[in-house]
A protein has these predicted regions:
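Acidic, low-complexity intrinsically disordered segments
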Residues: 2-25, 29, 54-94
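Beta-strand elements of well-folded, non-transmembrane domains
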Residues: 30-38, 43-51, 76-78
Length: 94
């Protein structure tokens, strides 16, 4: 089984954050290479935000991500590898 590292969680979270791009919902697939592993994250996610009012301006950072559905696949040269990806763990990096 492929063990998902904190670095891979960070990479997946960064790519998801970029794909959300200020929106309140994401549905799609993100494919990327991580080291010698090809990864594909497919999800439908509801994005909750918190409104922050500060002297330098307002912001609406992500306060929670609620997955409607998700899959995370990892592939090597030999084919697909089972992995221990956990959506809750990835949320810590968003």
């Amino acid at each position: 089984m492929y063990s998902v590292s904190s670095e891979l969680y960070h990479e997946a979270a960064a790519r998801l954050s970029d794909a959300i791009d200020g929106g309140n919902y994401f549905s799609g697939s993100l494919a990327f290479r991580f080291g010698d592993t090809d990864c594909r994250f497919t999800a439908s996610v509801i994005v909750y935000r918190t409104r922050l009012s500060q002297p330098e301006g307002d912001a609406e950072p992500v306060s929670d991500l609620v997955p409607v559905w998700w899959e995370f696949h990892t592939f090597s040269a030999e084919g697909e590898m089972l992995n221990d990806f956990d959506f809750s763990e990835m949320k810590r990096f968003v």
